[in-house]
């Protein structure tokens, strides 16, 4: 049985303090730059320029619920990958309910396009946490958006999701019911915007790793299970990593400070492709 959301929120406080510490107090010597891709105040992205040109760029999309402060609220993750030599791009985007679907997806495509066109990029690993995984999946699988923005999928080497909202029909917690109600104009839109419904036989066959905590009471594990099942149904390259005992917020521990014992598995996946 999942533990109650109330208990999970109590446990979150300790991790949020750790995130704050690494965001603003630790590793202050690590520099970053911010670039604008549009006119809205949230239309910018933060870049940590790594030292190893052989490594891919990490394009990390945060979840709107957890990181309303945008890239400033997840600098710890940028610093983590930077210390391993990666370039890291963290795009900001306009949030619901002030801005509804498809504004967030269009923002991500605009940020990605702006970065790629202004830099010499060979490979990109797209990562998304929580609702950011929905946006990450769209960047890889939304064919109409790729055509609209003229995105070259060939530079994306892999997709990694963390506790991702990948099947809206399985987002049954109160938190995500509220999120979806704010994100969409009506529940009738769910089928058409559900990330899992983007996958078909013609979808790109890039490697995908879905990471999910076994005790995630915010986003059901079924999201990742069903997403990987559908990818592999069409002969894709999907892998599922279930982390025993992990709750939704615990996944961030993988990429803060020095990471933990499971971080190596994910870094190994990144380095394989």
Question: Which sequence ranges carry the predicted segments?
Answer:
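Alpha/beta-hydrolase superfamily serine-hydrolase fold, recognizing
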Residues: 1-273
């Amino acid at each position: 049985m999942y533990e109650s959301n109330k208990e999970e929120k109590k446990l979150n406080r300790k991790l949020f303090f750790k995130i704050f510490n690494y965001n603003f107090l630790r590793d202050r010597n690590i520099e970053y730059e911010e670039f604008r891709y549009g006119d809205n105040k949230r239309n910018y992205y933060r870049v940590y320029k790594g030292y190893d040109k052989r490594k891919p760029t990490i394009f990390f999309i945060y979840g709107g619920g957890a990181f309303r402060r945008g890239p400033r609220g997840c600098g710890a993750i940028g610093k983590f990958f930077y210390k391993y030599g990666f370039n890291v791009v963290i795009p900001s985007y306009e949030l619901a309910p002030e801005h509804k679907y498809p504004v967030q997806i269009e923002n991500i495509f605009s940020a990605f396009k702006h970065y790629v066109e202004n830099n010499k990029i060979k490979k990109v690993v797209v990562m998304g946490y929580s609702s950011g995984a929905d946006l990450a999946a769209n960047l890889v699988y939304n064919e109409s958006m790729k055509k609209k923005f003229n995105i070259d999928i060939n530079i994306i080497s892999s997709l990694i999701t963390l506790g991702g909202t990948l099947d809206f029909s399985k987002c049954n917690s109160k938190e995500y019911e509220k999120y979806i109600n704010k994100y969409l104009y009506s529940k009738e839109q769910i089928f058409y915007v559900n990330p899992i419904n983007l996958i078909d036989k013609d979808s790109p066959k890039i490697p995908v790793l879905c990471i999910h905590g076994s005790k995630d009471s915010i986003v059901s594990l079924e999201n990742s299970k069903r997403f990987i099942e559908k990818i592999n149904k069409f002969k894709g390259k999907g892998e599922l990593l279930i982390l025993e005992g992990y709750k939704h917020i615990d996944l961030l521990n993988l990429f803060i400070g020095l990471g933990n014992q499971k971080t190596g598995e994910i870094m190994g996946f990144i380095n394989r492709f």
